[in-house]
Amino acid sequence: MNKQKNNRERTPQPEQDTERDEQLTNSHENDIDSAPAAEENDKVADPVEQLTAQLAALNDTHLRLMAEYDNYRKRTLKEKSELIRNGGEKVLVDLLPVIDDFERALSNLGDMSEPAAIKEGVELIYSKFMDYLQKQGVKKIETADLPFDADLCDAVAMIPAPSAEQKGKVIDCVKTGYTLNDKVIRHAHVVVGE
């Protein structure tokens, strides 16, 4: 009898089969119904993910550009400071031969008994120095017997003019003025006739 009882339990009952079929059908329908909802969520999630990725990429690009700009700014600041610090190097190197000439003249002063030779040596040094200044764009401001020009000259004294023609003109230059590429770098100090 036990065998029969076991057989009955093993053989599925038609009622149980229909219940199982209904459950499977219902779960399958639920899956089908939830599939469009999941697709809609994916569609909504995709743009959000895309925008998030795009935002991250833009932030990364922004940070890189800011770092690059900061490095550029630091590099140019360093270059400018080096130019300011070492900008006069060429000028000073070119002046060294003039200093050498002065040193030679000073060392030979004791041996020279002729003032004409000393004068000639100093004139050579002066000429060499003035040539160098002209190559750099430095020029003397000519003032002799010219009308007083306040843009180029500073009047340090006014004296009675020796003649009527010299009234308002430069009579003497106390300190020579210079221009660098047509810009006054030192005004001439002059005596003007009144």
UniProtKB/Swiss-Prot annotation:
Keywords: Chaperone, Cytoplasm, Stress response. The keyword Repressor does not apply. HAMAP family: GrpE. The keyword Phosphoprotein does not apply. It comes from Porphyromonas gingivalis (strain ATCC BAA-308 / W83). This is Protein GrpE. Homodimer. One of its GO terms (cellular component) is cytoplasm. GO terms for molecular function: adenyl-nucleotide exchange factor activity; protein homodimerization activity; protein-folding chaperone binding; unfolded protein binding. Participates actively in the response to hyperosmotic and heat shock by preventing the aggregation of stress-denatured proteins, in association with DnaK and GrpE. It is the nucleotide exchange factor for DnaK and may function as a thermosensor. Unfolded proteins bind initially to DnaJ; upon interaction with the DnaJ-bound protein, DnaK hydrolyzes its bound ATP, resulting in the formation of a stable complex. GrpE releases ADP from DnaK; ATP binding to DnaK triggers the release of the substrate protein, thus completing the reaction cycle. It holds the Pfam family GrpE. Induction: Low level background expression highly induced by oxidative stress due to hydrogen peroxide. Residues 1-44 are annotated as: Disordered. It is found in: Cytoplasm. InterPro entries: GrpE, GrpE_coiled_coil, GrpE_head. Residues 1-12 have a biased composition (Basic and acidic residues). Belongs to the GrpE family. One of its GO terms (biological process) is protein folding. The grpE-dnaJ-PG1777-PG1778-PG1779 genes are co-transcribed and may form an operon.
